Structure formats: structure tokens, C-alpha cells
Amino acid sequence: LGAYNVGPLSGIYCATKHAVKAISETLAQEVKAFGIHVTDVKPGFMKTEFFGSSHKTTAPEGSPYKHLYDENMKFYMGQNGNQAGDPKKAAKLYIKVAEMDAPYESLPMGTDCCDGIRDICEGTVKLMEKMRSVAETTNF
């Protein structure tokens, strides 16, 4: 979901997700003629320790970003153990897709991922409709 959604203090994480998405889509176009398929996997929140022990950090004392850090940590800790995604089912789906003759180009995993991407895309469409008249002022 980080390839579509960004948040405070997650710039580098989300940038890597954007990069994987762009590289996957580009690579898929480049190798299609060779019969090679590329699938961009987008896992939603899986019930792992991603929001648990891997997030046991603290904000530096006096950091002007401490409030953002605290908000993020509250979110992460609220998610920990409550993720809807089953990593074992995700692993089985990875294998199933890898064995397909024509695998999916994009593989969102989990309803949270599908719903999140849909909501973000709908927001982008609304923004483009709103900004259309401004954008066209740069046309010849």
C-alpha cells in the first residue's frame, strides 16, 4: 500500500514501494516479448511482527517530530496482532500466481489493500477533476 499512500515519517519506506511498483511495471513491458511475466505484489497488513518488535524504537528527545512519531507508533501498536492478512495464505497465493501461465500483473493481497488503493485512486480522480481547469491553462 505504501506505493500509493504516504504518511509522515514514512517517506523512505514509501519511496521504495513506489520504486518497486515503477520497476515492476517497466520490467513487465520490457520482457513481455520474451514471454516473461512480472507481478507487482502489494501485500496488505499481514499478521506478522512488522508492527511489533520491529517497531520498538523511540523518538529522539526534543525532536520536533515527536508528536508525529507518537501518532505513528499508536497506529502501529493498534495494528499489531489485528492485521487481517494471513501470511501463510499469502505464501500459497504467491506460489499459485508463480505457477500461472499468465499471472496477474498486479497482485493486491487483502481487502485492506484493495480498499486502500481504490480509495486513493478515487481521491486522485476527484483531484484531477478539480484541477482540470488549472491544468489546461498551460496548454497552447
Language-model regions: role of each:
Residues N5, T26-H37:
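Active-site-adjacent segment of SDR/Rossmann-fold oxidoreductases
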Residues T16-A19:
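Active-site helix of classical SDR
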Residues I36-Q79:
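C-terminal beta-strand-loop-alpha-helix "lid" module of Rossmann-like NAD(P)-dependent dehydrogenases
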